[in-house]
Structure formats: structure tokens, C-alpha cells
Amino acid sequence: LSSGEKDLVVIGSGPGGYVAAIKAAQLGMLTVCIEKYPTFGGTCLNVGCIPSK
């Protein structure tokens, strides 16, 4: 993660986080999204609700 000023920092890339980060970037904001997993989507999409069905 490079240092410097950002307009928006989104913590977590669940269903709300990644949409917020994408929309902010589309609106011209310098945006960074912090996620502990290697893929976006959060726990439900990657290891919880959807994969368990």
C-alpha cells in the first residue's frame, strides 16, 4: 500500500464495501479498499453463505 493522501479508505470488501469503492473511484475519488482475503466479496461470498450451499 503506497503512502499518501486518499479521498476514501474502505475497510472490507463485502457487498457494500466493494460497491462503495468502485463507485467512489468512478466519481473521481482517489480510493483504496483494504481487504484481508486475496479476493473481493467478503466472508459470505468467499467462504460463508454462497460456497456452503
UniProtKB/Swiss-Prot annotation:
| Gene Ontology terms describing biological process | 2-oxoglutarate metabolic process
Q: What class of enzyme is it?
A: oxidoreductase
Activity regulation info: Lipoamide reduction and the NADH -> NAD reaction are both completely inhibited by copper and cadmium ions.
Report one GO cellular component: oxoglutarate dehydrogenase complex
Question: How is activity affected by pH?
Answer: Optimum pH is 7.5 for NADH -> NAD transhydrogenation, 6.5 for lipoamide reduction, 4.5 for NADPH -> NAD transhydrogenation, and 6.5 for NADH-ferricyanide reduction.
- UniProt xrefs under InterPro entries: Class-I_Pyr_Nuc-Dis_Oxidored (IPR050151), FAD/NAD-bd_sf (IPR036188), FAD/NAD-binding_dom (IPR023753), Pyr_OxRdtase_I_AS (IPR012999)
Q: Where in the cell is it found?
A: Mitochondrion
SUPFAM superfamilies to which the protein is assigned, alphabetical: FAD/NAD(P)-binding domain
Query: From the UniProt record, which GO molecular function terms apply?
Result: dihydrolipoyl dehydrogenase (NADH) activity; flavin adenine dinucleotide binding
Tell me, in one coarse class, where this protein mainly resides.
Answer: mitochondrion
Q: Where does FAD bind?
A: E35, K36, Y37, P38, T39, F40, G41, G42, T43, C44, K53
Add the further remark from the entry.
The active site is a redox-active disulfide bond.
How does this polypeptide assemble, per the annotation?
Answer: Homodimer.
Q: What does this protein do?
A: Lipoamide dehydrogenase is a component of the glycine cleavage system as well as of the alpha-ketoacid dehydrogenase complexes. This enzyme has lipoamide dehydrogenase activity and NADH -> NAD transhydrogenation activity. Also displays some NADH-ferricyanide reductase and NADPH -> NAD transydrogenation activities.
Protein name, UniProt field:
Dihydrolipoyl dehydrogenase
* Upper lineage: Eukaryota, Metazoa, Spiralia, Lophotrochozoa, Platyhelminthes
